[in-house]
């Protein structure tokens, strides 16, 4: 280590350091002149034999190395002279690393560089100091180039240099731009499509190099192509798309059932208009309601006429004389529609001042039935809303008809007159009540059976 300390105090090295630290403009030229002088001394053969020791050539070789590296550093000094101290510290470190390397090289080059010696020094005698000197000169040049390349490789590994030119120099219009995908650095001029000012200076803009943009375009095209490839898969899915078509008949069936329900009510109205009793089955589609109304109608028809119910219905209808006509119209119409032939005859009798011979004629019921058809069809909605009529009997309907005629004039008096007219009209139609009640019971039973059958069919369909 003492030898290395003595080597650092070499006058040529100190002179080179002085030129390196100096801020004068001529320092670079003086340093170059010193380099040339040291190189001339190194080549001079008369100077080499005079030095018996091997160490002085080592010193000269280290000087050569140091001076070779100094011009590079000094070339950057005019741009920034303040960096001289930092560079000298790096220089000293490099020198300290080189000296042990020189000793190793002197041992290695004796075996490695012997074939090179005859080519370089044919006229000279191969004395040991010359061989050591020449071997040291050659590896030093190689070492310097190796260190330069290693520094460049280090900069490349760290990602600090341009990928194209492998340099870290940055000019005003030639900055290093980083690709956001591969994170490689490019000079703006080195990149083949030159980077514009907008791309380089806009911090919001993400810049990609040409290679990465090509790769990204390929990836984008690949990602767009796969949806086109499974087009046959979409065709294979079409059976699944056909499933809704299979399901559509079910929806159609549901629509048909709802539509049939409407048809069913229309059919029921037609049967009711044809002369069957208990219009409750027309108004309500629920089977429980139908059975209740039909049973109630059968019981009341077998029990006979009840004037109290008739009076209650007429009183309810005549409670408000202004609205009673509107409320009683559907009652009278449904009564017309649901009454049997005997009932129609009794209505005619009550309207025609109780003549017993008229109810036996068939034409009047036909005409009345037609009028009932037209009126009941026009007032279906009203009869569905109102419906005190289902509980009315055959004589009740006739009494309500007569009450309709009288209720427009007076409320309670109309009800009393309707009672009297119903009593008077019941006497001529008494002979016809028996068969009409039986017919109504039979019709109610038939309807119940039909409703039960239809309900069972619905359940089976579901």
Swiss-Prot record:
It is found in: Nucleus. A zinc finger (PHD-type) spans 159-215. One of its GO terms (cellular component) is INTAC complex. Residues 59-86, 301-328 have a biased composition (Polar residues). CDD domains: PHD_Int12. Residues 42-132, 301-462 are annotated as: Disordered. Keywords: Isopeptide bond, Metal-binding, Nucleus, Phosphoprotein, Ubl conjugation, Zinc, Zinc-finger. Signal peptide: none annotated. Belongs to the Integrator subunit 12 family. Component of the integrator complex, a multiprotein complex that terminates RNA polymerase II (Pol II) transcription in the promoter-proximal region of genes. This is Integrator complex subunit 12. It comes from Homo sapiens. The gene is INTS12.
